[in-house]
Amino acid sequence: KKLAGFSEEYGLLADFDKEADLMFDLLLINGCVITVDSAHTVYQPGYVAVEKDTIAAIGPMSDLPVLPEAGRVIDLCGHAVLPGLVDAHGHAGHCLIKNLFEYRDDWDDLAEQVYYQCTDTEFWRAEGSLAAAERIKFGITTGVSMVGSTPRIDIIEPVGANLEGSSRVGIRQLSGIGCANGPWPKKARAWNGKEYTESTVTPKMAYRSTEEALKAYNGRHPLETCIVAPGRMGLRPGESAEDNIAHNREMYRLAEEYGVPLHTHAFAGDIQFLYDTT
């Protein structure tokens, strides 16, 4: 008589009785439900039950001899459903410039120049909305983005604008900054409403700006989470081992202190270096 919904692995298990009066806010039925769990469980046909903003239960349609009451029922016959799927890596900014440097080997450097010198808050807000719309188009309602190609660390407004632009479309968005990649120093321009002001960007500015963003934007909106998102953790080329260790430890400290995810790139040897030194 008991139905076990979703997976204990993700803490979303919900048991309920077939004979009880059930009421869900949303019930998706007859879809091909791909759970994205470690067992690669697929229910076809299957259902997904939602209460408020939480997946309450999933399973095969055979577990529902009579449809429970629901505020809304959607028949997804012929469609795939991936409950809980997260687009776990993106770069805020790329949606608006992704075709500009398509055939250039130096596209990453050019993207950094655009992000640091040719953008304002409206750029980041508009890009956040466009990226969110594209994610929704492909059935994804939670996204994670690093703000910039390598994070822009001289100001925090791009983070807030990207979160706002994404959340107003209706998705749950996690965006952030952290230690940026070289070369150093970088040149940045910021729009103050009347003109651009120029500044020189140094690596340790990321410590201050990352923490300021965490303080400013977490708790502002239920669909927005500001995270720690350094461009790379491990052993960055062009920096000493001591500097890398300091960067890595500070990013870890901020994520732990503010209780947010730590999201980054890591390449050959980075994981071992982090394990040995952080």
Predicted regions and their residues:
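Alpha-helical scaffold segments that flank or form the walls of functional sites
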Residues: K98-R172, A206-H221
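N-terminal metal-binding scaffold of metallo-dependent hydrolase/deaminase domains
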Residues: K1-L67
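Extracytoplasmic/periplasmic beta-strand context in beta-sandwich domains
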Residues: P45-Y47, R72, C226
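N-terminal-biased segments
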Residues: A80-N99, Y103-E127, P203-Y207, E250-D270
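Metal-coordinating catalytic core of metallo-dependent amide/deamination hydrolases
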Residues: E157-T278
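Divalent metal-coordination and catalytic microenvironments
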Residues: G31, V48, D53, G78, ...
